[in-house]
A protein has these predicted regions:
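A conserved mid-protein helix/loop that constitutes part of the nucleotide-sugar donor-binding site
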Residues: 18-26, 208, 212-231, 248-254
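N-terminal strand-loop element at the rim of the active site
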Residues: 10-18, 22, 26-78, 176, ...
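A short helix/loop element that forms part of the nucleotide-sugar donor recognition site in Leloir-type
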Residues: 189-203
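Active-site donor-binding acidic/aromatic loop of nucleotide-activated sugar
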Residues: 241, 249-252, 262-272, 278
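A short, active-site helix/loop in glycosyltransferases that binds the activated sugar's phosphate group
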Residues: 149-189
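Short hydrophobic beta-strand element within catalytic cores of glycosyltransferases
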Residues: 307-311, 316
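Aromatic "clamp/platform" in nucleotide-sugar-dependent glycosyltransferases that forms part
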Residues: 100, 271, 290
Length: 380
């Protein structure tokens, strides 16, 4: 299913582990790749974790890097020029951009300047003034009014993501398309045998396992999560916290755990391509992010019947099953501890049918992608 006759569109997604990239790869796996396939635009010239997977599906990795330029100002100029040449030299006709207005509208401008006929802007982030710097806010506000002149299709994973990324008239007039973050639902179905095996392998058979998956950055609010767990551990000494992911704040969070003397109870698990098994081992999934467009991890956790505790800053579109509860970040940490403890006797079973009805089956999302882009390509 990797025909040379397949028509390709260019998508922006880093090829390391992450929610957006995982979603795009899952969609790609469900395409009829004899008809439509993805190529990937990356901004850094290095081998990444998921690169071999997409190359194996017939994709090309297209690099527009300026990492070889030391001067910061010149690096920016060089990156823009190389992006322009990338679009021009590869005769790109369709670009599917996963991003936000403050960081990615430059790519849109360059794409249009180079002759790209159709740009879809697909936003996954609901943003937050808590962690965004002033320059980012200023750039976002400056770019938004320009978007309708350069962007051909507006897609969002949630209403909050649309409000954060798109001009007001696009949101008010509902010009954007809601695209659920589809997953391979069956892969996450609850399985008691897998749960028991993974818990044995991890050495947490008799533990109350709290889980989290997310990049170590300010947005994900790991500091708050660790503080909540520290309070929980004082009341439940059988509790352990499994943190999946990597990122720039991982080391500082490890130092925080050491200061709290929780090294034996908080485990930094790194990245894995078997998260579906890790959800099985957990008892509660906690996500206190400052904001989320629509967290894929929250959908995956629900599919496995795992109770999910979210900050009320996270979009409500993820609230599909009876597994989900929300709490304000302004609440005392004792309220979070109490809510986590309330899940000890939660009845665990798969919720995949509920999620399928809500549109979170990656097969349905892939079908929409394919029909949409084949129709666009037919018109070009």
């Amino acid at each position: 299913m990797n025909s040379d006759k397949a028509r390709h569109i260019l998508v922006t997604a880093p090829l390391g582990f992450g929610g957006i990239t995982s979603m795009m790869i899952n969609i790609q796996k469900n395409l009829d790749r004899d008809k439509l396939n993805f190529d990937y635009l990356v901004l850094h010239d290095r081998h990444e974790d998921l690169e071999d997977i997409v190359l194996g599906m017939g994709s090309k990795k297209i690099v527009a890097s300026a990492d070889d330029v030391r001067n910061k100002f010149l690096r920016g100029i060089t990156r823009w020029y190389r992006l322009y040449r990338t679009f021009k030299d590869n005769n790109i006709k369709v670009l599917h951009l996963n991003g936000g207005p403050s960081s990615d509208m430059n790519i849109v401008f360059l794409a249009k300047l180079a002759g790209v006929k159709h740009v879809t802007f697909h936003t996954h982030n609901a943003g937050s003034a808590v962690y965004r710097n002033k320059i980012s806010v200023i750039m976002s506000n400056a770019y938004k009014p320009l978007m309708p002149a350069f962007v051909d299709s507006f897609w969002a994973c949630s209403s909050l993501a649309a409000q954060f990324s798109f001009p007001k008239k696009i949101v008010v007039n509902q010009v954007y398309k809601f695209i659920p973050n589809g997953i391979a639902l069956e892969k996450y179905a609850f399985d008691l045998t897998i749960r028991e095996k993974v818990r044995r392998d991890l050495g947490v058979e008799n533990k109350f396992v709290i889980g989290h998956a997310g990049r170590f950055n300010v947005q994900k609010n790991h500091e708050y999560l660790i503080d909540v767990f520290a309070s929980l551990h004082k009341e439940c000494n059988d509790a352990v916290l499994l943190l999946f992911g990597d990122g720039e704040l991982r080391e500082s969070m490890q130092q925080k755990v050491k200061k709290l003397h929780l090294e034996e109870s908080v485990h930094f698990m790194g990245t894995t391509n078997e998260m579906q098994k890790m959800y099985q081992a957990m008892d509660v999934f906690v996500m206190p992010s400052f904001c989320e467009g629509l967290p894929v991890a929250g959908v995956e956790a629900q599919a496995s019947g795992l109770p999910v505790l979210l900050a009320d800053t996270i979009t409500k579109e993820v609230d599909v099953t009876d597994c989900v509860k929300y709490l304000p970040l302004s609440k005392d940490k004792s309220a979070w501890v109490k809510e986590i403890q309330s899940f000890r006797d939660f009845k665990r079973y798969s919720r995949i049918e509920e999620l399928r009805k809500a549109g979170f089956d990656e097969k349905d999302v892939a079908k929409y992608f394919q029909n949409f882009y084949l129709n666009i390509l037919d018109k070009l």
